[in-house]
C-alpha cells in the first residue's frame, strides 16, 4: 500500500509538472521589460517568449506577434524551443508508461515487470525535468548577463519573466515525481535469481583404507 501511495503521489506531481511546463513554454513571459533608470514610467511593456512577443500599452491594450521565421531566431531560442518540446513529449510518455505499470492498474500482471516499467517511467520523468531546467537556466543566465553588461542599452535590458519561475517549479515537480516513482521499485525485483548452490563433498577414504587393511589380514 505504501508503494501504491508513492506511485500516485509521484504521478500527481508529474502531471502538475507537465502542465506547468506546457504553460511555461506557451506564455510569452520569458523576458520582460526592465524598469531601470529613467524608464520607471514607460508607455509600453515588452514581453518575449519562445513563440511570440507582446507589447502591452499603458492603456491596457496588448498586441502579440508570432515569430515569422524560424531560421531568423537566435540559436538559444531555437534550442530552448526544441528542448521544451522534447521535454513535454518525454514527460507525457513517462506518464503513460507509469500508468501502464502502476500497482492500481491491471495492464501488466507480473509484479517484476510492473516494477521495471515504473522505474523506466521515473527515469523518463527525471530526464524531462532536466530538459526543462536547461533552457530555463540558460535564458535566466543570458538575461542576468545582459542586465549587468554596461555595453547593452537600458532599453534592451530585460528581467526574468514569470515563465522562468514557473519553469523552475515545473522542472522540480517532474524530477520529484520521477524520483518518487524510482523509489517505489523494490530492489528484490531486479536481483538476478540465484540458483541452488552446487557443492561437492570429498569422498571418504576410510572405506578404501579399511578394505586395504582387510586384504592384508
From Swiss-Prot:
Which GO biological-process labels does this protein carry?
A: calcium-independent cell-cell adhesion via plasma membrane cell-adhesion molecules; cell-cell junction organization; tight junction organization
Q: Which UniProt keywords apply?
A: Cell junction, Cell membrane, Membrane, Tight junction, Transmembrane, Transmembrane helix
What GO MF terms are annotated?
identical protein binding; structural molecule activity; virus receptor activity
The membrane topology of this protein is:
Multi-pass membrane protein
The record's annotation in Pfam families points to: PMP22_Claudin
User: TM spans, by residue?
Assistant: 13-33, 82-102, 117-137, 160-180
Q: Which InterPro entries match?
A: Claudin, Claudin9, Claudin_CS, PMP22/EMP/MP20/Claudin
Query: Subcellular location, in the record's words?
Result: Cell junction, Tight junction; Cell membrane
Q: Which GO terms describe its cellular component?
A: bicellular tight junction; intracellular membrane-bounded organelle; plasma membrane
Q: Please indicate the ranges of residues that lie on the Extracellular side.
A: 34-81, 138-159
PROSITE patterns recorded: CLAUDIN
Per the record, the major location class is other
Topological domains annotated Cytoplasmic? 1-12, 103-116, 181-217
**What is the documented function of this protein?**
Plays a major role in tight junction-specific obliteration of the intercellular space, through calcium-independent cell-adhesion activity.
Subunit: Interacts with CLDN1, CD81 and OCLN.
**What family is reported?**
Belongs to the claudin family.
Q: What is this protein called?
A: Claudin-9
Supply the gene name: Cldn9
Amino acid at each position: 500500500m505504501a508503494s501504491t501511495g508513492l506511485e500516485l503521489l509521484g504521478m500527481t506531481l508529474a502531471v502538475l509538472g507537465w502542465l506547468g511546463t506546457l504553460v511555461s513554454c506557451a506564455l510569452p513571459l520569458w523576458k520582460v521589460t526592465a524598469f531601470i533608470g529613467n524608464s520607471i514610467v514607460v508607455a509600453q511593456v515588452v514581453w518575449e517568449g519562445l513563440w511570440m512577443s507582446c507589447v502591452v500599452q499603458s492603456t491596457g491594450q496588448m498586441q502579440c506577434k508570432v515569430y515569422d521565421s524560424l531560421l531568423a531566431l537566435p540559436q538559444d531560442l531555437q534550442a530552448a524551443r526544441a528542448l521544451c518540446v522534447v521535454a513535454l513529449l518525454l514527460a507525457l510518455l513517462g506518464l503513460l508508461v507509469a500508468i501502464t505499470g502502476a500497482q492500481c492498474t491491471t495492464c501488466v500482471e507480473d509484479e517484476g515487470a510492473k516494477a521495471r516499467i515504473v522505474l523506466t517511467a521515473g527515469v523518463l520523468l527525471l530526464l524531462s525535468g532536466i530538459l526543462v531546467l536547461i533552457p530555463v537556466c540558460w535564458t535566466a543566465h543570458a538575461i542576468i548577463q545582459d542586465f549587468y553588461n554596461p555595453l547593452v542599452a537600458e532599453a534592451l535590458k530585460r528581467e526574468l519573466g514569470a515563465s522562468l519561475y514557473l519553469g523552475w517549479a515545473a522542472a522540480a515537480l517532474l524530477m520529484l515525481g520521477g524520483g518518487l516513482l524510482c523509489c517505489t521499485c523494490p530492489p528484490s525485483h531486479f536481483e538476478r535469481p540465484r540458483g541452488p548452490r552446487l557443492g561437492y563433498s570429498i569422498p571418504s577414504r576410510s572405506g578404501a583404507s579399511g578394505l586395504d587393511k582387510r586384504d592384508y589380514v
